[in-house]
Amino acid sequence: MIYHDMKLSQTVKGPRANLLEADARICHGVPKGFANLVVTSPPYPNNFDYADATRLEMSFMGEVKRWADLQEKVRQYLIPSCSQHVNEKSVDLGAVLSSPELSPIRQEVSEVCGRLAEVRKSRGGRKTYHLMVACYFRDMARVWEVLRAVCDSPSRVCFVIGDSAPYGVYVPVVPWLGELALAAGFKSYSFEKARDRNVKWKNRKHRVPLLEGRLWVDG
């Protein structure tokens, strides 16, 4: 329906939009040096299941019949940002942390993943946050590498993003993404805070102050 609305709007004079269905880690169909501005909001590594957010629409359209169908239809294609996206039996944490994409932040990510792996032992759910964090930043590093290829020089990228603290362990998402962008070939980054998070509700799971805003990357 949204697609057809966009097609209809193209009959009006003005700039035209092209809708591509592609993986941000590959950007198939986008020419090299195509863009000089990218504005997007990637998944936040805060254990929100973006696949589950599509369940109502996909059920209505007949694309899924039960909750388990989301794994085959959606989850396996997502950047891991939820513990349900990573299976302890199928992810080799050591191999992920050793991947070349993580070299700019390997020590910091390894330390955080180690703390998460230790904390989960004392938690009932034993959620695989340590695997989620490692896989998330490896995949986001791949996104930055592809963005560098499809962006002109100079260009500007804006990520609306927020940090995270699974099990109360702080994950500095903004500087880590910024460092990955620099490693991919961009020149500089800055952050513009929009709001504070995890400060409103008294029944929140942890007391770590979080923020959300715009990560600006130039180069």
Language model features with spans:
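Helix-to-beta-strand junctions that scaffold the AdoMet/dcAdoMet cofactor pocket
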Residues: C151-S153
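SAM-dependent nucleic-acid methyltransferase catalytic core
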Residues: M1-T40, P45-D52, Q107, E111-G114, ...
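Class I S-adenosyl-L-methionine
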Residues: F186-G219
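Short alpha-helix
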Residues: V143, P172-G185
